[in-house]
Amino acid sequence: MASIPSFPLWPRPVRRLFGPLETSARGMGIQQRFLDTIATNIANAQTTRTPEGGAYHRQVALAGADPATGETMTVVDPTPGRMVYDPGHPDANADGFVEYPNVDVSVETVDLMMARRVHEANVSVFQAAKSMLRRAIDL
């Protein structure tokens, strides 16, 4: 994910004016990464075979240690998937069990709602900062 450019060459007072815009834009970028990861998890909640082999494993998006950079990373949840006895399934092992993903759709839905609300809050902050800048320019 590309990081949001900062304004290092601009004079300090100008950078301060754009600070709220930059901060909320970074927040929106981080939340978008969370939303994308959650959507991928939900879409693969029943995927028993991946190109790498085995069932899909839930991914978790994490914000970097310094949220000001807007950097995120995605890690794989190592929790094993649930085993279901289904000897007729093409992905069943020798004992007739199929490993299903470790994705709980209800947990993903709650995470999705939370990420969406935080994203909306960042959009509101961005709009408010933009409105204040326009008023300042009109003065």
Residue positions per predicted region:
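Amphipathic alpha-helical polymerization modules
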Residues: M1-L139
